[in-house]
C-alpha cells in the first residue's frame, strides 16, 4: 500500500536490518561504479565467465565498461562450493566489493578485505573462490 509509511519497525529484527544494510551498500555500489550501469545494452560490455556449472546453480559474469570491470559470482543452491573457478585470458586480481554472506547482512562470513589473484595453469589464468549457499559476491577486477 503506497498510501502508508514503510514498516520501519521491522529494522529492529536482525534479518531485516541486515537486508536493509545490504541493499543500501548495493545501491551505493551501483551508483558509484560505472560498470554497473553504463553500456547496459551493449553486448560487448557483458561476458559470461561460468555458465557450465548450471547443475550446481553457479553462474559468473563480467561487466566491463572502458577499462573498468566488475565480476559477479552467484551460488543459487544450498551447497557450499570451494574453489569454484573461471579462466581468464590475462593475469588479474579480484577485490571483493560486497558479499551477501557477510555476517553484517545476516550471513556467516566475517567481513574482511578479500583479494583473489589468478593463477597460471599452462593454459589460462584461473581465478578460484569459495561460494557459500545462496550467495552473491561482487568484485572489482584489476589487471596485474
Residues covered by each model-derived region:
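Carbohydrate-interacting/catalytic domains
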Residues: 1-144
Amino acid at each position: 500500500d503506497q498510501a502508508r509509511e514503510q514498516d520501519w519497525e521491522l529494522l529492529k529484527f536482525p534479518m531485516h536490518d541486515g537486508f536493509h544494510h545490504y541493499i543500501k551498500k548495493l545501491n551505493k555500489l551501483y551508483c558509484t561504479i560505472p560498470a554497473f550501469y553504463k553500456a547496459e545494452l551493449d553486448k560487448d560490455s557483458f561476458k559470461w565467465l561460468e555458465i557450465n556449472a548450471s547443475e550446481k546453480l553457479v553462474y559468473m559474469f563480467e561487466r566491463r565498461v572502458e577499462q573498468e570491470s566488475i565480476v559477479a559470482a552467484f551460488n543459487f543452491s544450498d551447497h557450499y562450493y570451494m574453489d569454484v573457478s573461471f579462466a581468464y585470458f590475462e593475469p588479474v586480481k579480484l577485490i571483493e566489493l560486497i558479499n551477501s554472506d557477510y555476517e553484517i547482512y545476516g550471513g556467516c562470513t566475517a567481513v574482511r578485505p578479500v583479494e583473489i589473484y589468478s593463477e597460471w595453469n599452462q593454459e589460462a589464468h584461473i581465478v578460484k573462490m569459495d561460494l557459500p549457499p545462496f550467495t552473491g559476491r561482487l568484485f572489482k577486477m584489476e589487471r596485474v
